[in-house]
Amino acid sequence: MYMSTSEIRAAFLEYFRSQGHQVVSSSSLVPHNDPTLLFTNAGMNQFKDVFLGADKRAYNRATTSQRCVRAGGKHNDLENVGYTARHHTFFEMLGNFSFGDYFKQDAIRFAWEFLTGTLKLPKERLLVTVYETDDEAFNIWANEVGVPVERIVRIGDNKGAAFASDNFWQMSDTGPCGPCTEIFYDHGDHIWGGPPGSPEEDGDRFIEIWNVVFMQFNRQADGTMEPLPRPSVDTGMGLERISAIMQGVHSNYEIDIFQALIKKAAEIVGTTDLSNQSLRVIADHIRSCAFLIADGVMPSNEGRGYVLRRIIRRAVRHGRKLGATDVFFYKLAAELAVQMKDVGAELIAQLPLVKRVLRIEEEQFVRTLDRGLLLLEDVLANLGDAKVIPGEVVFKLYDTYGFPADLTADVVREREIGIDEEGFNAEMEKQRARAKEASSFGVNYNEVLKLDFETPFTGYKQLSQKTSVVGIYKDGVEVNGLIAGEEAVVVLAETPFYAESGGQVGDCGVLKVDDGIFAVTDTQKAGKAIIHKGYLELGTLEKGALVEAVVDGERRQAVALNHSVTHLLHAALRQALGDHVTQKGSLVGAERMRFDFSHFEGLTMATIRRVEELVNAQIRANHDIATQVMDLEAAKSAGAMALFGEKYEDDVRVVRMGDYSTELCGGTHAKRTGDIGFFKIIAESGIAAGVRRIEAVTGKGAIDFMHQMGEQIEEAAALVKGDQFSIADKVRQILDKSKMMERELEQLKAKLAAQAGSDLLSQVIEINGQKVLIAALEGADPKSLRGMLDELKNRMKSGVVLLATSSDDKVNLIAGVTSDLTGKVKAGELVNLVAQQVGGKGGGRPDMAQAGGTQPEAVPAALQSVHSWLEERL
């Protein structure tokens, strides 16, 4: 019975709804509050806390069709996608779940009833496996369901340890775990392969379609298995696999959704070979890329963004392989939205963003793709009998041309060649070490000071307090005291000084003691201890001394204003650009602030102005800035934004600014948004692929900036003899005049070059009856060589021309051959002959070619060598 993919999905959810299950929407591909996961890769991910007992739901039975991505991390088999029948970066997992409700009997019954009743699969085509010692599951299959015992396979511990089996599931080394039973479909004896547990089990005849996990134990650290008080069920069935069976095909790429995408991709790139594996790659990759972007992931050079970038670039490379000459990948997103309309509401809503991001990413990559492929072809041509591309070459392709290592591997595998992964990783480590060395400044206090206590911070409510010195450190070594002029780090019993964190700079101020003053120039953290860096201005300071710690209040207030505005800016950027915007970093100082965020293109002036208006509107609204400490889950339920990658304690501080912004933040803030006064963006730039940076000023700093800009405009207006209202027109007039003069200058240079070319005709010689001109020109403009060459070829009618000019350490070469002689002499070969002798290389067409070099002193000998070379060819 044929069923479309959409019909199967709907039938699955409806069947389990009728069995009392709550139909739950697919969660985002970005896991919520689970830093252990790169992407959502299974249906149970969104219920993990429910299974662990940390979360409760209003239902105890659920069913989903979960979007999943498996690429990167331990699931990195990207190179196989498109080349096998069932490898994908994106797939849908159908699942039903019991949270302490039903267990083995009902779970097995539901699965069998759906497969044989709803889908009407032939029972004789189904085979099941159980864990070797799970007699309960075996008996349910044999005695209650009626599966013949010869079609029930017991699978033992086949992974080298107790309870390490294909049929024993565990969440991690400890915690919930249990046996599972799997259902396989037999595609028939015309396909090679054996049943699970046999030597031929890796064949394609028997395909797993449903895995039913019975969570019945809690694994302890010592390996003992304690029964769970409320056993649960977690199941998963790949939608693409069951669709292939229901549609009578063997490969997932032959099902309806993939065929529609493959046909559309073929139409876009202009190919008629629908069996080409590159079309499979593209059809798979548009699914993962589009849904990842719709769920807020942007291409970048790290983490999830880098996995997305790798997938996009692999798809682009396969498109070029098929003959695509223009950007194409983004055009497939609309067809995907049509095919996934039943479950793709997020994709449809974000379709304009998805297409824009894919187009921009492809445009950026194709600029270097062809050059990188040329380099790779060069390497392959000179590889000889070797079967591995050196790691240094793989790294150069990554570092210079943006080729992820697996993309290079994908290209060369077609020649049955591999890559040196160890060598590549070694080069990556060298680069990381260089970056770390280049960015290292000052002292890493976490490494130098091994402090094992926590300093209480009192600075939210006060800027000064009496406290005591519990430690003094000079150059990382603890000392008992200081004298005037000495630099050191001081640790207090408690402090009102804010230590740098969350992008906010550390406080400055003074520590006052009876006969001395310690100037605090910076405040940092060493572990959980707060340390005060500075120097003793006068007097002495000893360990144990009572001091008055006084924060520079004016500076703290300026920093607080700038910190508060980062929250408003974050919210405004998400409102103006979309929910994909997330904070990537910040620096909040007293004079200005900067804010790094995920976005794929530069902001237009109109967008910058809109963001400024949104922020300033919230400043004028004069919202109360309220802070509250609550537990992490309650904070997230209240809508507080958490930054991915940040580690949070169980209790967190929530900063709320009206209804506009709610974030988790430990920094200091203004009392009301109106205290900020005024917000002005002074710069916007890209700092990495997929990451933009805004620099801005607030309050008095913003007013000072506007005054400075006004003064500069007035000064510029005076220079062009205008005023602030006519300056743009005046500058435009000057630029137009400058362009006209540049054109006249180029025309004059061309005339002079033509004249010089005429003068060179007296140096023409004959080699084997053909005219040849070889000349070194002193002080000639390299830009004029092309015009000079054309003039000489026209005047000579037939012949070979080679011109060289040099200045400082640079050589410029150009060669020309008239069309009647290109069968004997190629300009590209001629210019390359000389270039190699002067420390360079070059190339071009048979009739004209250019090159460069770095050894002017070698030019005379190189030109002389041309005579004998031409004698052999003319």
Swiss-Prot record:
Subcellular location: Cytoplasm
Keywords: Aminoacyl-tRNA synthetase, ATP-binding, Cytoplasm, Ligase, Metal-binding, Nucleotide-binding, Protein biosynthesis, RNA-binding, tRNA-binding, Zinc
Protein name (database record): Alanine--tRNA ligase
EC number: 6.1.1.7
Molecular function terms, GO-annotated: alanine-tRNA ligase activity; aminoacyl-tRNA deacylase activity; ATP binding; tRNA binding; zinc ion binding
One Pfam family linked to the record: tRNA-synt_2c
SUPFAM superfamilies named in the record: Class II aaRS and biotin synthetases, Putative anticodon-binding domain of alanyl-tRNA synthetase (AlaRS), ThrRS/AlaRS common domain, Translation proteins
Domain comment, as recorded: Consists of three domains; the N-terminal catalytic domain, the editing domain and the C-terminal C-Ala domain. The editing domain removes incorrectly charged amino acids, while the C-Ala domain, along with tRNA(Ala), serves as a bridge to cooperatively bring together the editing and aminoacylation centers thus stimulating deacylation of misacylated tRNAs.
HAMAP family referenced in this protein's UniProt entry, alphabetically: Ala_tRNA_synth_B
Superkingdom of origin organism: Bacteria
Catalysis performed (reactions): tRNA(Ala) + L-alanine + ATP = L-alanyl-tRNA(Ala) + AMP + diphosphate
NCBIfam families per UniProt: alaS
Name of the gene this protein is made from: alaS
Organism encoding this protein: Aeromonas salmonicida (strain A449)
PROSITE patterns (alphabetical): AA_TRNA_LIGASE_II_ALA
Biological process, per Gene Ontology: alanyl-tRNA aminoacylation; negative regulation of DNA-templated transcription
Chief site of localization: cytoplasm
